[in-house]
Amino acid sequence: MRHFKVKAMVQSLDISAITGQQTDAEPSKRSKPSALRRTLQALRQRLTKRNRPKPPDWFLEKFSNTTNTDKIGKGCPAMEDAALSSEIRGSSVLCNRLSVDPTLQSHYRWLAIVSLAVLYNIIFVVGRAVFWEINKSAPAFWYTLDYLCDFIYLLDTLVHMHEGFLDQGLLVRDAFRLRRHYFHTKGWYLDVLSMLPTDLAYIWWPPETCSSLYLPCPVIVRLNRLLRINRLWEWFDRTETATGYPNAFRICKVVLAILVLIHWNACMYFAISYEIGFSSDSWVYNLNGTRNNTLQRQYIYSFYWSTLTLTTIGETPTPENDVEYLFVVADFLAGVLIFATIVGNIGSMISNMNVARVEFQNRMDGVKQYMAFRRVGHELEARVIRWFAYTWSQSGALDEERVLAALPDKLKAEIAIQVHMDTLKQVRIFHDTEPGLLEALVLKLKLQVFSPGDYICRKGDVGKEMYIVKRGKLSVVGDDGITVLATLGAGSVFGEVSVLEIAGNRTGNRRTANVRSLGYSDLFCLAKRDLWETLSDYPEARSTLTQRGCQLLRKDGLLDEQIFADSQRVHDSIEGGIEKLELSVENLNMRLARLLAEYTASQAKIKQRLAKLEMNGGPGTWRLECEPQSRARSGRLYSLQPKRRPRSRPDATAKSSDAAKQNTL
């Protein structure tokens, strides 16, 4: 709103200034614009430019995976009929209203609000249950905060009930399925228990009864609000994952846990002092005196005693009865276990924060030892050390390949495109190239750092890489190494034609100049081998890149047209031969498949005939005995042999029938 008000004010002032000037001065004698008018115009232009939406980037649009159908498809799982677009749109809106995506930033902010309510109950419900002066100071204020937190709990129950979950990799948004899933989780029971109206106990146990004579205070009935602590852990996990400083956040989380434990233990000490009796001995809290009877003194002393006990420092009054001894022993044991764990976690966090520095220092020490062992000159050793220092100052010696190794290739390609977008735009031969080719090439870019005075390439060297300047200055020098012919800055590209190996290149794919780094320079390198490995899967892109490379060579007069034409004819003839060979292989495969089908069909027919003969044949009949079809084709004929039924007695009928069944072909 403030931005639009300022813009409107500037426009109104500008208009008034213009009208005033036109009325005061004649049209033929218009004076020059005043300084105020020029200032207002510049301010209006700046505000308009800032408010103007950023135009879409053509380079990133080629890699965009989101479409309109994807946006529509994010509705209910039952959206399958594309023809019913209106119903799909209506059901999508309805499901989206009844579901919450837990990955959205708005859901994370809501968790932060719920976490504040939970943290309030963790600290003040326990504290107000023991320190009665807190409730007496501002009861209306505390009741307002209590029921505000209850309202947040109620809203969070509705949000939690409609939180989407993943089923077979898809986010479920159907309201009925979300509620059914929620009612079968542990969170449902915790939410219900944390929302029980235990404040109804105030009817029989009024909060006004809280005093030094009646502890704990009635607010202790709200302890069930602490059961919503799982939402606080969820917010901690989300924050630790999303933050750019996870180690610092972990340390803050551990410190918060320590303070909460000390706070609870201080409340326990004050409650035990009440049970034993204030001022009854030297161990319990001494309530005598005006100063000791204040809330500030009571809490600070209890917190101090709790800190000394849990940290096992001691130096507290000696217990005098069994209850005091048991409480102190339990505190010491809890302090040893809890703080040993906490100190160990903090130590590991601090060591993890310095892992990159330690690894980098070890590598640098190893290089130093090697140079000392090989007696490398002091000048070269100093250059190496300066290179290490520059690398650490720029990127912290970050190994990008190792960091991104856990990601799939698709995500790595998208990250690389976002990071190297401006770099790839500078390469002329890659303009309007297939997105798949650029996705494959962007993963093969290697970052190289050159020190002052390092030669990136020399004249006459075989071109095996192309370079893209990311940061720094390069100079193109003559053969004497002194004369500067040109200066290259960020975004400059050189060597892109040499990696294409174009026949007819008068330079013979060799470097035509000496390129030297003026200061520390960061260059992206693309090797010829990586380029051609990628182009093997993109034949059309390969021909396109070759044509663009030829155009660049023709522009500089470095292409021999005759040699290039001859190579193209040879290449076309080879390509034609390969196509004919592929066509012949395809025809042979088709013929082989047809013959195999005929053979399989004939085998099936023969098996059917044999099975039919076996079923129809019986004793005293002629049976066909044949050899396999392969033998029959070799010249062997079928043979007919009579099978006579043997004479047998009536009681041997079963045996003769069994013997007849055993006659085979």
Curated annotation (Swiss-Prot):
BP GO terms, sorted: monoatomic cation transmembrane transport; response to hypoxia
InterPro entries listed in its UniProt record: CLZ_dom, CNG_cation_channel, cNMP-bd_CS, cNMP-bd_dom, cNMP-bd_dom_sf, Ion_trans_dom, RmlC-like_jellyroll
Gene Ontology, cellular component aspect: intracellular cyclic nucleotide activated cation channel complex; plasma membrane
Major localization listed first in the record, in broad terms: membrane
Transmembrane segments: 111-131, 139-159, 187-207, 254-274, 326-346, 482-502
Keywords, sorted A to Z: cGMP, cGMP-binding, Glycoprotein, Ion channel, Ion transport, Ligand-gated ion channel, Membrane, Nucleotide-binding, Transmembrane, Transmembrane helix, Transport
Expression sites by tissue: Expressed in antennae and the visual system.
Glycosylation sites: 135
Region (Disordered): 633-665
SMART domains: cNMP
Topological category with respect to the lipid bilayer: Multi-pass membrane protein
UniProt-annotated location(s): Membrane
Family: Belongs to the cyclic nucleotide-gated cation channel (TC 1.A.1.5) family.
Full protein name: Cyclic nucleotide-gated cation channel subunit A
Taxonomic lineage from the root: Eukaryota, Metazoa, Ecdysozoa, Arthropoda, Hexapoda
